[in-house]
Amino acid sequence: MAEFHDDDSQFEEKSKSQIKRELHALQDLGERLTTLQPQLLERLPLTDPLRKALLEAPKHKAHIARKRHIQYIGKLMRDQDVDAIVALIDQVDSSTRQYNERFHALERWRDQLIAGGDAALDAFVGEFPECDRQHLRGLVRHAQHEAAHNKPPAAARKVFKYIRELDETKRGLR
């Protein structure tokens, strides 16, 4: 009688639970793709049916209809190069995160300038030497006056806009 050798290293079948986890991960990725803007979807290596399904997703408002559509997107995701899609999404998330960090840093500069006086202005000019100190001082004084009189922060917005323009010039974006 022939002996039967069970060699597990040759065949590694996925359990039903593992398959379900992978399919749910594809659905989650598909749901994440539905939140992207259409111009970003154009950059992704997607098949036409999937691209169409992703663009139709916002039309489904009812909970069950949306859930069913996400499941359909998950089914279409099985035929995709998921690694390339994830890499591009990570790149977009990273650039968005960097933009938000820079935006918050500029907001902190604005708040320090309005609250801090000459010491904050000197520190800012040290960071941005191409700054028109007199113009910035006028904007800051106007913003301080508005804050003291509980007026809308129009001058604070102008301070932020000027700071952002200086930052973009410094980083070569202008």
From Swiss-Prot:
Keywords: Cytoplasm, Ribosome biogenesis, RNA-binding, rRNA-binding. Coiled coil: none annotated. One of its GO terms (molecular function) is rRNA binding. It is found in: Cytoplasm. InterPro entries: DarP, DarP_sf. One of its GO terms (cellular component) is cytosol. GO terms for biological process: assembly of large subunit precursor of preribosome. Its main location: cytoplasm. The keyword Cell membrane does not apply. Belongs to the DarP family. Member of a network of 50S ribosomal subunit biogenesis factors which assembles along the 30S-50S interface, preventing incorrect 23S rRNA structures from forming. Promotes peptidyl transferase center (PTC) maturation. This is Dual-action ribosomal maturation protein DarP. It comes from Pseudomonas aeruginosa (strain ATCC 15692 / DSM 22644 / CIP 104116 / JCM 14847 / LMG 12228 / 1C / PRS 101 / PAO1). The lineage of its organism: Bacteria, Pseudomonadati, Pseudomonadota, Gammaproteobacteria, Pseudomonadales.
